[in-house]
């Protein structure tokens, strides 16, 4: 660009022209301009002819002379005509699109992230087109790769990458003609992170080079709404804003939900986090408009298709449905059908068709009096059902975690009943109350029988739990007042009156004295938590307690305070029914499961609170049962695995209702001299007179069947010195089963683990299985 000169840069003007400037266009007319142009053209022709001579050489002032047609000129021309080539061997253009210079926008489609980058997780691969096919295609309709954001793909572990890919294929209809799936991974495998990855990917990209969905809804228990918000913020680092529905007035809630539902695109908060209860109340608003996808956390809440929450969620206008549950099957096939039908309606037909085709045949084959033909038909129908649901269910066990977490030791401790407990227990079994309960039962347990079972469980824990029944001379305790000591005081806990409490008291004292380990105490009854509190105050232990009475907001603060290493809280008292799911208690590395639940899923959920991501110490899990009592019967029910298929699990919160009269007779039996009723029924071939002569197979661990664990009738060989010392001191332990997890292989962080082993093929099991899934053990487990 020409720049005008400043006055100081110009030379002196002539006097006569100082004030007589005339524009050039006015000095020359049109004719003179034409003449000047012709003159210039003539000079150019003469200049060119003067440069040529007879030898066709160019005269240059340089000393070099060469011909225009020389080999050198041709070589230079060939080099200049060569197309540009990327100086990398075997390089393939990343997106295959054309590039244009300047400000004009390229119309060819490109994926959001590089599919050939290191550690890239590609969920969709477009068809491979030849160059000839590309020439005839509309560039605006070419499909592109769907690539997970590197922010997430670089931290996903191998099994999590597989889970994200599986869910994407399901919701996009790549696995049949359905768009739903069930993520049935066990606790601690990162189901939340996998769902965050799926939602973020669908909100930002798709094969059509545009977002697949505009908004999503995450439905969870009210205690986990805040946790979901934290997870989105943690993994996406604030890149996505969520709309959590917790608290607030009714007017504000309605306004927020209407704005979320009515906005179709460019929504500031495209993810709604809402509890099951709130969704049911405001379902009319949320079901008016379409939504891209719905995720249901703790999805086993939808096992009853007749409840209002299930029906409200079924009315949601979306085809993409993801259900999260570590325990997708908790009772029978009807509940299992409800879950599958929620994510993929009509996959299994109507309820009547499903019952006729599958349920009736399978249940007939499970009866003890079924014929061989009925059992074979049941097996065939079970395999047919598995083949159908395999395409929409993925399940991995926490066996995968063993390579990332410190070692875990699990121990099932059989504690003897004290003399007072023993007398109360046997007197109640011999009472007219139990005799009438058994007489009233014909095919199923009566309500009185179920109440008697609860009474026996309380006797096993501590006499304080039935003190009111004793003083009131309740049925079964008419003559039990003399059993208690004369100075008995229910308000002042005496651990010596209970074998389990005596053992717990000894072990807590040893743990407190030997180091800085923290402990989680879990029970199914809040009354037992009250006894824990009395013990903690008696021994002056710092503690926190979480049960159903605690508000949702306060729970998070309590957990954070306990996990703080500087906190003086030694004990965390937890009700398994109130807070067994979603809690991360890695501040502790020792956990006592004080009483067993009929549903093994509840116990597994609760016991997984300490052995999870972030844990740095070896973990010790203690499961306490009273020797020979109903608690051992419950343990046996938990470990029982039906012979037909691991798809059908015999575990339910109200499993007692399915007991036959013969089952109840077995529950109301007791042998005071037995070391372990469970070990006797195993008919263990590795033990002689309750002494282990042969160790378990090398390839077993704490996920194996109890018959494949270590069996100890004394304190030698125990993995925990504290338990070994308590066995000697309190002399209330009769038998111990113990095993450990596989040794930790990867000490690196999750990010490093994911990047170091991208090629690993994790253990993948699509169909749900029992917690103890060693098929070879069933042959020895004859008594169950």
UniProtKB/Swiss-Prot annotation:
Q: Where is the composition biased (Low complexity)?
A: 747-756
Motif DEGH box — list its residue ranges: 297-300
Q: Where in the cell is it found?
A: Nucleus
Task: Identify the SMART domains for this entry.
Answer: DEXDc, HELICc
Bias class Acidic residues marks the residues at 775-784
Which residues are annotated with the PTM Phosphothreonine? 22
Where is there biased composition of kind Basic and acidic residues?
36-47
Chief location of this protein within or outside the cell: nucleus
InterPro entries to which the protein is assigned, alphabetical: Helicase_ATP-bd (IPR014001), Helicase_C-like (IPR001650), P-loop_NTPase (IPR027417), SNF2-like_sf (IPR038718), SNF2/RAD54-like_C (IPR049730), SNF2_N (IPR000330), SNF2_RAD54_helicase_repair (IPR050496)
Chain residue ranges for the region called Disordered: 1-50, 747-784
The UniProt record lists the EC number as: 3.6.4.-
In its UniProt record, a GO molecular function of this protein is: ATP hydrolysis activity
Region annotated Required for chromatin remodeling, strand pairing activities and coupling of ATPase activity sits at 2-9
Q: Which GO terms describe its cellular component?
A: nucleus
Q: Which GO terms describe its biological process?
A: cell division; chromatin remodeling; DNA synthesis involved in double-strand break repair via homologous recombination; double-strand break repair via homologous recombination; double-strand break repair via synthesis-dependent strand annealing; meiotic DNA repair synthesis; oocyte fate determination; oogenesis
Residue positions where Phosphoserine is found in the record: 20
Q: Does the keyword Hydrolase apply?
A: yes
List residues binding ATP: 185-192
First-level EC class: hydrolase
Annotated ranges, domain Helicase C-terminal: 503-660
Annotated ranges, domain Helicase ATP-binding: 172-346
State whether it acts alone or in a complex, and with which partners, per the record.
Interacts (via N-terminus) with spn-A/Rad51.
Question: In which family does this protein belong, per the annotation?
Answer: Belongs to the SNF2/RAD54 helicase family.
What functional role does this protein have?
A: Involved in mitotic DNA repair and meiotic recombination. Functions in the recombinational DNA repair pathway. Essential for interhomolog gene conversion (GC), but may have a less important role in intersister GC than spn-A/Rad51. In the presence of DNA, spn-A/Rad51 enhances the ATPase activity of okr/Rad54.
Record protein name field: DNA repair and recombination protein RAD54-like
Q: What organism is this sequence from?
A: Drosophila erecta
Traced from the root, the source organism's taxonomic lineage reads: Eukaryota, Metazoa, Ecdysozoa, Arthropoda, Hexapoda
Q: Which gene encodes it?
A: okr
């Amino acid at each position: 660009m020409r720049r005008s000169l400043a006055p100081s840069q110009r030379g002196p003007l002539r006097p006569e022209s100082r004030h007589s400037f005339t524009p050039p266009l006015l000095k020359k007319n049109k004719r003179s301009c034409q003449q000047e142009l012709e003159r210039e053209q003539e000079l150019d022709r003469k200049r060119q002819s003067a440069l040529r001579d007879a030898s066709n050489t160019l005269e240059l002032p340089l000393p070099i002379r060469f011909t225009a047609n020389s080999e050198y000129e041709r070589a230079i021309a060939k080099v200049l005509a060569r197309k540009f080539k990327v100086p990398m061997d075997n390089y393939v253009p990343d997106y295959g699109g054309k590039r244009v210079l300047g400000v004009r926008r390229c119309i060819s489609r490109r994926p959001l992230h590089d599919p050939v980058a290191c550690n890239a997780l590609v969920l969709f691969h477009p068809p491979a087109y030849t160059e000839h096919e590309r020439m005839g295609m509309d560039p605006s309709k070419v499909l592109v790769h769907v690539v997970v954001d590197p922010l997430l793909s670089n931290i996903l572990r191998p099994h999590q990458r597989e889970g994200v890919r599986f869910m994407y294929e399901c919701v996009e209809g790549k696995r049949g003609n359905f768009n739903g799936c069930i993520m049935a991974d066990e606790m601690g495998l990162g189901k939340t992170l996998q769902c965050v990855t799926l939602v973020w990917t669908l909100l930002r990209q798709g094969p059509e080079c545009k977002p697949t969905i505009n908004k999503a809804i995450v439905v969870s228990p009210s205690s986990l709404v805040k946790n979901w918000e934290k997870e989105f913020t943690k993994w996406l680092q604030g890149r996505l804003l969520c709309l959590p529905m917790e608290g607030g007035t009714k007017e504000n809630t309605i306004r927020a939900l209407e704005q979320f539902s009515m906005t179709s695109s460019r929504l500031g908060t495209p993810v709604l986090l809402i509890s099951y209860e709130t969704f049911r109340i405001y379902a009319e608003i949320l079901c008016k408009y379409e939504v891209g996808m719905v995720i249901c956390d703790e999805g086993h809440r939808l096992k009853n298709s007749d409840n209002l929450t299930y029906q409200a969620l079924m009315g949601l206008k979306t085809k993409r449905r993801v259900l999260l549950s570590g325990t997708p099957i908790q009772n029978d096939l009807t509940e299992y059908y409800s879950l599958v039908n929620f994510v993929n309606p009509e996959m299994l037909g109507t309820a009547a068709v499903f019952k006729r085709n599958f349920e009736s045949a399978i249940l007939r084959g499970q009866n003890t009096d079924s014929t061989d033909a009925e059992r074979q038909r049941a097996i065939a129908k079970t395999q047919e059902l598995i083949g159908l649901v395999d395409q929409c269910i993925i399940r991995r066990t926490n066996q995968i975690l063993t390579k990332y977490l410190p070692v875990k030791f699990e121990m099932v401790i059989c504690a003897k009943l004290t003399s007072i407990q023993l007398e109360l227990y046997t007197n109640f079994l011999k009472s007219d109350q139990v005799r009438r309960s058994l007489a009233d039962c014909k095919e199923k347990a009566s309500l009185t029988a179920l109440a008697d079972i609860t009474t026996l469980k309380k006797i096993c824990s501590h006499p304080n739990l039935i003190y009111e029944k004793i003083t009131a001379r309740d049925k079964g305790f008419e003559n039990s007042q003399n059993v208690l000591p004369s100075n008995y005081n229910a308000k002042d806990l005496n651990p010596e009156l209970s074998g389990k409490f005596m053992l717990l008291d000894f072990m807590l004292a040893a743990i407190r004295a030997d180091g800085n380990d923290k402990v989680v105490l879990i029970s199914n009854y809040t009354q037992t938590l009250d006894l824990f509190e009395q013990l903690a105050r008696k021994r002056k232990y710092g503690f926190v307690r979480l049960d159903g009475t605690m508000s949702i907001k306060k729970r998070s603060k309590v957990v954070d305070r306990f996990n703080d290493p500087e906190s003086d809280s030694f004990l965390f008292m937890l009700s398994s029914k109130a807070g067994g799911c979603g809690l991360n208690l890695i501040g502790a590395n020792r956990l006592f499961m004080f009483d067993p639940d009929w549903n093994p899923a509840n116990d597994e959920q609760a016991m997984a609170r300490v052995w999870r991501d972030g844990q740095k110490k070896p973990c010790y899990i203690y499961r306490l049962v009273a020797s020979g009592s109903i608690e051992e019967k419950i343990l046996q029910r938990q470990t029982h695995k039906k012979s037909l298929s691991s798809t059908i699990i015999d575990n339910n919160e109200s499993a007692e209702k399915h007991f036959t009269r013969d089952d109840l007779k077995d529950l109301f039996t007791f042998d005071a001299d037995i070391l372990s009723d469970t070990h006797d029924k195993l008919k263990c071939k590795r033990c002689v007179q309750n002494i282990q002569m042969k160790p378990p197979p090398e390839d077993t661990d704490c996920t194996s069947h109890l018959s494949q664990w270590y069996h100890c009738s004394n304190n030698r060989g125990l993995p925990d010195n504290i338990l070994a010392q308590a066995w000697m001191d309190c002399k209330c332990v009769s038998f111990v089963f113990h095993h450990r997890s596989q040794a930790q292989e990867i000490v690196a962080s999750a990010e490093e683990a994911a990047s170091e082993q991208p090629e690993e093929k994790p253990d993948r099991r699509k169909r749900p299985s029992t917690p103890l899934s060693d098929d070879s053990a069933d042959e020895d487990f004859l008594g169950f």
